[in-house]
Structures are given as structure tokens and as C-alpha cells.
Amino acid sequence: MYAPIALFLSLAELLLYDPSKLPLFGLSFGITAAIAFALFYSGGFGGADSKALMCIALALPFSTEALFKPLIASGISPMSQVLFPLAIFSNAVLFAAASGIYMLFHNVVWNVRHGRKIFEGTLAAESLGKKILVLITGYKVPVAKLQAKWHVYPMEDVVNDGGNPPKRKLVVLPRDEGRSEIVGRLSSAVENGKINDYVWATPGLPMLIFVTAGLIVSLLFGDIVWLLVSFILG
């Protein structure tokens, strides 16, 4: 429902006041839609995240400086003037990256406090890439929390091969499908004393949260990535 209304209002505004921007409107939406689809099919975005980004592109294809300027005037980047949804997206990616830094710091502190290996048992044999992804997107939680919190997803699984300790593997792209089965296997392994109580999990934050934050910050302060680059380059 939101997309048709946004499209109608944007087209009406452009046709009435500035028809010359219609090609740029198509360009802005086309590039944003291409990025949204690519991220969706690669697993980086959920369906709701992709739709939200495309709806934003329909409603706010260009910078809103004509209505009100950001609190930081230099935050209006050349890209945001023509491709405002991409400025929102870049801000969202920046916030997502910041959450990864927080997760990494949290895991280092957890390791120091508990004095355990971060990757125990057969998890130590997993690839470096998988370990890095888990370190910046997940953290250790008791199995009981996995059972109680539906929005927390396991990032490791137990292969019931009869070994003691059993073989464990990292799950870098947790999904709703199979979640309860994985939690059941982890719980059983903990109850039988085959693995420690703390396992890898992720809060499963949708990218939509970061996109929303990116939208608000873009309206209030502008393109944060542009501001950072401008500051670094002097």
C-alpha cells in the first residue's frame, strides 16, 4: 500500500513542479532497487528490508534540502542530492558496521572474564572467515536463553555423530527454518555434559532497524560517510 502512494505523490510533485527530474527519479529508484534485490538474493537483506529501501526510494528519491536543511550543512553530499536513498543506505551500513565493532568488543570482554576459549572443540577447526563473521555478528549465550528468546538465533550446531565431545560447526547465516531443531540438539548436548552451557548466538537484528536509523540521521545530519571522508581528507 505504501509503495503506490509514494510513487503517486512523487510523480505528481515532479510532473507539476520539475518534470526535468523524472529521468533522475527513475535512475534513483532503479539503482536502489538493483541494490535491494542483489542484497536480498545474496542473503544480506530480508524481504521486508528490501521492500523498505525501495519504498524509501519512491518517497524520497532526492535530498530534502528544499524543505529543510540538515543540522550540519556540509552533510549534503553530491550523491545525496541525486541518489538520496543511497545516502540513507550508506548510513545504515555504517551503523551495522558499528554494531559489529561492539559485538567484537563484547566477545573480547567475555573471553577475558570467563577465561575460556572463544571457539571450543571442533569449532576451532572452522575457517577464519566464518570465525570473523561470528565474532562481529554473534556472542555467547546460555542455551536456556536460546530456548526462551525466539528472536535469538543459534550460530552453531551439533552433529550427532556419537563422538564425545560431538562435532560442532558454525552457522553463519542463521534462519527461522530449522531453528528449533538446532536448539534442541544444543540443549541435549548441554544436558548430557558433552558441551559447555554457553553457545554462539545472534540477536537476529533486521537490517530494517539500521535503515530506519540511517533515514533519521540522513534527514537530521546528512550523509555521515561523506562527512567522515571530508573530515579525514581535510
Task: Report residues per predicted region.
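A membrane-topology feature that recognizes alpha-helical transmembrane segments
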Residues: M1-G234
